[in-house]
Amino acid sequence: MPPFSARAASARYAVCRSRTAVHGGDNVVLTEVRSRQRETLAAVARHARSLAGAVADDSELMRLLGGAEFALLGEASHGSDEFYRERATITKRLIVEHGTVAVAVEADWPDALRVDRYVRGLPGDANGNEALSGFRRFPTWMWRNTAVLEFVEWLRGHNAALPPAERVGFYGIDLYSLFSSIDAVLAYLDREDPPAAWRARRRYACFESYREDAQAYGYATRFGMSPDCEDAVVAQLRDMLSHRAAQAALEARGDAAARFHAEQNARLVRSAERYYRTMFGGRVASWNLRDSHMVETLEALRHHLGTARSAAPRIAVWAHNSHLGDARATELGEHGEWNVGQLLREGHGNAAALLGFATDHGSVAAASDWDGPLEIKRVQPGLAGSWEALFHDTGIARFALLLRGSGELAQALAMPRLQRAIGVIYRPETERQSHYFMARPVQQFDALVHLDQTRAVEPLDGSEPHPPGEPPETWPSGA
């Protein structure tokens, strides 16, 4: 992949501007820009695969995703109904026709575990709405919405016809549940290994004075006002991972999954402790730590699910484009950020298939500020010079672009343009500054779906503030 450079892109436009002195004014430059715009638009229109029905009806796209071990299914916002429903339809086909065995979402491990137990038919919640009530932090609508509920109920029905060992799981890959994960580790050890639980309590006691405010822990340790808990949480994780004899005994009686969940919560505590200490040092370091944890979780999940299978397990991942598109193809990568899409491509090559989504206008469920109430907001049409505006100008309401090895299309899309990202916060009054960055989707994704008009998700209930001591699920970026 050629290195991305927003500065180089800006320099090209500066050269064009400078040529006005030689060629007699702005008209020459405007003619060149408009000619390039027409060529790019024509190339997109030629290669656009119009979608009359569901995105999953495109057989070539499904062949690309179905052949991957990691099918990364993005979204351009956290509050657009179509993105959730199209991902759900794609995932159903991946499960039924291509053997996908896990759905991993941009959510915390303990919250998703309730859903996992429900879809597997294990004791606990009586229905999908109850199972999704574990998602209590802002923004509740991100996973507590009708599209997710319908998928969860479908997955439970699908699993009911399968032997327990073949049922498809539902997992969280994010890292915000520091205290929930501590509680989960202790509860597991209290039940399975009381001496180990005593050791874990001594280690995790380091957090006691910050139980109501994990961000205060991060601030105090970052600026030297309090010792950190890094050694304690690392020691606890090592302790759990070293007890392979206990693991073997659990496998013998069918409880290996419980042990894996406990180990993953210990990993999350380790990552969350680092994250809180890093979050006051700048966006790039905290973002990179978060996405590294997501990839570590996916790799651990892949290993866990693969122990009982002859072939590598296939996993569908639901998260924002900003996590799943290759960061190296964006100006964010130029600033030092990496993400899930980049790391999985580097580690697995074409075994990771990256699907992005885009929209031009419509409505979205979002807040104006952190912990603010849910609002249904109008999505502004894409800015001039953006990919969203270009896709809108094709006049095709719904289409897919297959970008991997796309030849002519790749050449036409080589110049970076603005790309929009709406997280859980949407501020149309500062649209350019808050929601756009430069990107080259032809290197960012293996395929891209444009849905010209989208509507807001339907929440199952009103927005609620996050529990004390834990930040919103998408702090600090909204994605």
Where do the model's predicted regions map?
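Structured catalytic-domain cores with a bias toward divalent-metal coordination
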Residues: 19-479
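Low-acidity, Ser/Thr- and Arg-rich intrinsically disordered low-complexity segments
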Residues: 5-19
